[in-house]
């Protein structure tokens, strides 16, 4: 089984190019935004793509579509996979896509993100058997 992490990275650049994105919460504010899929154990990049910015400054590919696009690579190669994502990529649509292709999906779930769907919340008792 393969363990894959999906995340984004901003490669710093201050040139004049329509692909440069402004991210105020990143250490480098301006640069090229890449969505990257890499192996958790080796750190080798398996798949990536450059995010494009539309005319109005919004991304043409949403985070959910970006993650689905990266996940399709492992589905076509028939790899049993566990995907690890951060809070920006976790959604019901991606969970259903992973389930349909018999893959595992681990991500951080925020309570306000899943308002139309109900999730079971269980309190974990620490230190009890």
Stretches with model-predicted labels:
Residues 1-129:
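Acidic, contiguous segments within the catalytic cores of piggyBac-derived transposases
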